[in-house]
């Protein structure tokens, strides 16, 4: 396989090829207007950033941090840092003061780049507690800088330190010295058990990952890739860099809450997403079907059935559809299914990689049935995203996570653990020798902590090994499987399954309050607060009955028998969620110990 150019110079190589073609579409902070930046302009800004970093005293292998939501400045900073051999460390925009203080001190960060007021305020408050930290550089010009803060500098003013490229000869020399073995990023994992470790990623890992993914993921310079997930997340970072490296036009969505509007305004052809996004799409479409006329419901259900037979039964298995089915699909696609995709802004869709959690089979079938090419995959921060994914040249199975990408050796070890070896796998965790010894087998395979199996070359996951529950009857429960089925329901927003050393499975449920409140009003349920709503027997009965319908495919011992409705969301602030919005089970179980015990009272 052909290797790609080093990340330190990739922006400039692409500018030579694509010139004034748009590289990025984005919105400035506080603006509702989409703007474009060409490859040439981006290359120039990256050079300015590299020069500015040297002028402010940065030296090769120094650490910088980026504490921001997605924005153009984020990418300028990253690639500017790569150009002068700095290590860029991304922080989630939602990270707490305690988290960023720990990461800054652990990695000995010198400069921190922040997005908006919230991130600046947190960085300013912990500045004195971080002895290596010298500068806070602010992306959003409207941020109010604290009085007497000599460390703060707006990004516009930071770039002025690089105007005219005064240190470009030194930058060019650093390009020549760039090595694939150099450290590129440290990504701190927000583990579901609370521990945070810095995953070391080198330029060589990126080179291997981009090369392998380009061989199996159908993205090209004809695509428009929407950046939806935080670029701090390795899945989004990997897919953004892949899209950029092949010359795709990248659309930067800054506010995740505006993603639906952004999609309708910009019509992307590609976007990486997590299963929860598609669950929400599925629920919204079903809600519209339910409110339609009987004739419209019948037509749509027929279209979905045709779409399922064409896209799932035939295309997914690489079977040729019959002439009649092909003609029937062409008709329903043109008259009905395309309208669904258009309403989502996905009528020009190419591929939509999906990973980060288990995809409910019902949701995966639905997405394919409406003609959206969901590419399900599996990966970790430690593997620089993709380990495996569905491929266009091979049959795929609903519920699987695809085939290993080129260069990745996957085998199943003790306890059915998925083990990995290959050029994209991290060399280890930053300053964590003990953790590094535990992370690898004696023969050099990385321990993923995920249980799974391989069938006909395709990888299937069971659950996180540490999450597997054993009931008091000796039966094993995979909570993510149960939760993924329950989350399909429109009345349920969050769920935490309980089963370990218990007689049966129960669940803590956070309702989708808007819809449950509407249902309650329609059915004469009186309530004055969310606490009243969650305590109401009629509401509890309705939700439990819906759960029983959803979990019919599960074995009897896997099925949820009792539920407790929680009147507020699991949150980052309470420590119940990681920055990637995964449930921290030990914290949730501790916070709701009383409610859990009540479910098991005789």
Language-model features, listed with the residues they occupy:
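Conserved ATP-binding/catalytic segment of the ANL
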Residues: 404-471, 488
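Structural core segment of the AMP-binding/adenylate-forming
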Residues: 56, 83-161, 542-548
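ANL superfamily adenylate-forming
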Residues: 28-31, 120-179, 285-339
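Conserved structural elements of the adenylate-forming
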Residues: 47-48, 180, 199-220, 338
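Conserved pre-ATP/AMP-binding loop-to-beta segment of ANL
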Residues: 19-22, 137-138, 163-188, 195, ...
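Conserved AMP-binding A3 loop
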Residues: 36-40, 184-210
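Conserved AMP-binding/adenylate-forming core of the ANL superfamily
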Residues: 24-71, 75-79, 96-101, 154-163, ...
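Conserved AMP-binding/adenylation subdomain of ANL enzymes
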Residues: 207-224, 231-334, 348
